[in-house]
Each structure stands twice: as C-alpha cells, then as structure tokens.
Amino acid sequence: MSEPFQPADARRFEAALRRFDQENARDPNQETADGVAQPRELLYARRLNDRVLRLCPDASEPLRLAARCQHLCRWEIARSSYPMTRAGYLQWRATLKKFHAQKAGDILRELGYPEDVVHRVQDLNLKKNFPDDPETRVLEDALCLVFLEYQLADLAAKTAGDKTINALQKSWQKMTPTARAEALKLNYGPHEKALLERALKA
C-alpha cells in the first residue's frame, strides 16, 4: 500500500490549489455538471485533476499542481483572436501553452515555491519531453480521457464526422495502453461510440 501524499509544505500546496481554482472560477463561460452550472475552466481543472490521480495515485506534487492549472484562465485568449485556419489554430494553441505556464509560474513564485518546482510544473504544462517523460505521459493520458469523457459529444455534434475521427485517432495515438483501456470503459452515446469504432478500425 502506498504512503499518503505528503507535499513539501501542505499549507503552500493547498494555497496553490486554491489560487488556481480562484482564477478559473472567474471564467464567464458556464458548463452544467450534475445539474449545476459551473465556470467551465474550474470544472475542467477538477476533472483533469481527478483523472490524473486515478491514473497515478502516487502523483508527485508538481504533477498534481500541473493538473490543476493546465488550462489556467484559458478564456482570456479567445480562438477568434487568431485566423480561423489550421495554422491559426496551431498558433493559438502554442500561445495558450505558454500563457498557462507563465500564469502558473507567477502564482507558484508568489507562494514561495522554489524555482526547480516552478520549472517542473511549467515543463509539464508545456508537455516537454513527451512521450519520454513518464509524468508528461500521465498528464497527456488524462487530457485525452477528459476529452473523450466530457468533450467528445459536443465536438461530434458540431464537427464533420471525418474531422472528429481524425481527432480521435490523434488522441488514441498519444495514449498509453492503460489509458486506452480506460477509454474503452467510458460510457459513450451511440453516435460517439460509432465514431470511435470507425476511428479505431481505420
């Protein structure tokens, strides 16, 4: 049986999670979960955090922090501020990664985290050394599973089937066998299940 998680400084760790949640609670976009409307990025952060801990109960402090701030204040840089092209999308995503990492680093430094921890969290935010870094793989697995469980239905409803299948295939390629097994256990609607089956057969 593994030892209970013990952060280097419990008060500092809890303060960091609170700060991340406070920032994400400002999201003007709402999403309903269990019948309650919640700030979208706050809900996303908690779902990602939960999935990381289910995949890796012994997750390190930097990985736990990274899971909680991966999309920190994402709404502040709108997709519409970049060209509505593939190149524009990629530029937007690259900018967001740096933005999240910078904001997370600012908060962690303010709370007194040492630079090695700050840099480690930012490296995870930026998904550096993927797929060689085991913790980055856990984070990517969790990101893919949150997408499949909570975002696939919305994407499938708004996007052409071939594009959704392409997104599914890209996610599947990045996932470990453990995450793929978890993905197959998720409850999908008939349309989403059919798309996933097509993606895996292609």
Residue ranges of predicted features:
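Divalent metal-dependent phosphate-bond-processing catalytic cores, especially two-metal-ion Mg2+/Mn2+ enzymes
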Residues: 2-18, 22, 35-42, 46, ...
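Short, charged, low-complexity loops and linkers
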Residues: 22-31, 83-84
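A ubiquitous short alpha-helical element
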Residues: 32-36, 87-93, 134
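His-Asp-centered metal-binding catalytic motifs of divalent-metal-dependent phosphohydrolases/nucleases
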Residues: 61-80, 100, 104, 123-129, ...
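Long, low-complexity, intrinsically disordered polar/charged segments
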Residues: 66, 81, 86-94, 192-202
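Membrane-targeting and insertion segments and their boundary/processing signals
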Residues: 71-78, 91-95, 119, 138-142
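Helix-adjacent hinge/juxtasegments
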Residues: 80-123
